[in-house]
Amino acid sequence: MSGLRPGTQVDPEIELFVKAGSDGESIGNCPFCQRLFMILWLKGVKFNVTTVDMTRKPEELKDLAPGTNPPFLVYNKELKTDFIKIEEFLEQTLAPPRYPHLSPKYKESFDVGCNLFAKFSAYIKNTQKEANKNFEKSLLKEFKRLDDYLNTPLLDEIDPDSAEEPPVSRRLFLDGDQLTLADCSLLPKLNIIKVAAKKYRDFDIPAEFSGVWRYLHNAYAREEFTHTCPEDKEIENTYANVAKQKS
């Protein structure tokens, strides 16, 4: 009979269910699904991912989570369906010393991009040509707020003994040089904005927003982000009907 050595921990059984793409198998466009996918990857825990075809939910899923849309999680055979509560549960349960904490150190790292997606949604849904400039201006204002935050050094980066002006921040991500829950929340939305706004409004994030572009370049260099992103065409398909022609 084989037994565990004293102090040996058993890996939890984790299965994440995410929205499937248009082919019914690949990863679909769902920023909340990607958010949890990134968190699990960054935690370094073993887990399985199942894509759910929303056009024909398999019978076993109807039994497992009736009336529930992805993302949802099965953790040691226990179903969890609220993605905010799932995030909190994973952060508390998959904790040091075995797993890293992902909570940001600075509250503003979470808050700074909170209005960006709402401004994008209003912009992409607008069909009135004369109103377009105002919606675009509101979106750019949020990008400017994000850019200012990313270019402003965090307290960790400032030398209190130096008389010189603090330099422009060179940190990789929102809260420092490590990806945190704040990035898992914002990056999937930024990717959607970049793809959909370009496709349907010919909008590019202005090059002058150097902090935003530095952030995106660093993020796209990380597999935890790029390998959890849907294909661009999935994002474009999602917004094909939403982004109606301006009249």
Curated annotation (Swiss-Prot):
Residues 151-171 are annotated as: Foot loop. Expressed in adult and fetal brain, heart, skeletal muscle, liver, lung, and spleen. Detected in adult stomach and testis. Expressed in fetal thymus and kidney. It is a single-pass membrane protein. Residues 76-239 form the GST C-terminal domain. Disulfide bonds join 30-33. The keyword Zinc-finger does not apply. GO terms for biological process: chloride transport; regulation of cardiac muscle contraction by regulation of the release of sequestered calcium ion; regulation of release of sequestered calcium ion into cytosol by sarcoplasmic reticulum; signal transduction. It is an enzyme of class 1 (oxidoreductase). One of its GO terms (molecular function) is glutathione peroxidase activity. GO terms for cellular component: chloride channel complex; cytoplasm; cytosol; membrane; nucleoplasm; nucleus; plasma membrane. It catalyses: chloride(in) = chloride(out); tert-butyl hydroperoxide + 2 glutathione = tert-butanol + glutathione disulfide + H2O; cumene hydroperoxide + 2 glutathione = 2-phenylpropan-2-ol + glutathione disulfide + H2O. It comes from the Eukaryota. Residues 95-106 are annotated as: Joint loop. Residues 1-96 are annotated as: Required for insertion into the membrane. The channel conductance is regulated by pH. Monomer. Interacts with TRAPPC2 and RYR2. In the soluble state, catalyzes glutaredoxin-like thiol disulfide exchange reactions with reduced glutathione as electron donor. Displays weak glutathione peroxidase activity. Can insert into membranes and form chloride ion channels. Membrane insertion seems to be redox-regulated and may occur only under oxidizing conditions. Modulates the activity of RYR2 and inhibits calcium influx. This is Chloride intracellular channel protein 2. The gene is CLIC2.
